[in-house]
């Protein structure tokens, strides 16, 4: 199609991308609130939190439009979660919220990662430690009312998982 348009319009269309995709994605240095981290380590299992760069990157953007995808592909994100926590229960949630209040830490919810709520647009002026709260391990059906066709589910359940559990 490009050669046809070039010939008809007598112009040359440059097909080289304006930006080159970044081969290695970078994340900023972590902003650590040490007293908060010490309590996290004592209250949560080791597999419930991570500082790993790829997880921090994944939990610092959504897929809510080309703007977010562009920023990831071309290293244009300016703010990243400092820590990712995977909550597994209501008790975990309550503990985490209380610790965040106590230590003045910013919590950001992470569901499926699409960012339809824009919660993952982390404000670049935020100076506190930012913790991404991943709810995907909260993936159970809490209750079912077959008569009224109502289901109460945990925050991290996906449509596919819900369908599978309802089939049982």
Q: Residue locations for each model-derived region?
A:
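Noncatalytic alpha-helical scaffold of FAD-dependent oxidoreductases
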Residues: 1-168
């Amino acid at each position: 199609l490009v050669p046809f348009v070039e010939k008809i319009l007598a112009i040359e269309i440059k097909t080289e991308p304006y930006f080159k995709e970044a081969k290695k994605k970078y994340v900023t240095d972590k902003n650590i609130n040490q007293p908060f981290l010490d309590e996290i380590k004592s209250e949560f299992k080791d597999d419930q939190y991570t500082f790993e760069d790829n997880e921090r990157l994944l939990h610092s953007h959504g897929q809510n439009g080309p703007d977010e995808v562009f920023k990831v592909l071309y290293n244009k994100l300016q703010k990243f979660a400092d820590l990712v926590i995977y909550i597994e229960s209501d008790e975990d949630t309550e503990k985490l919220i209380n610790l965040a209040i106590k230590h003045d830490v910013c919590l950001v919810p992470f569901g499926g990662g699409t960012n339809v709520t824009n919660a993952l647009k982390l404000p670049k002026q935020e100076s506190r430690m930012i913790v991404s709260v991943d709810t995907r391990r909260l993936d159970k059906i809490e209750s079912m009312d077959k008569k009224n066709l109502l289901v109460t589910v945990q925050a991290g359940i996906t449509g596919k998982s819900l369908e599978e559990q309802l089939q049982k």
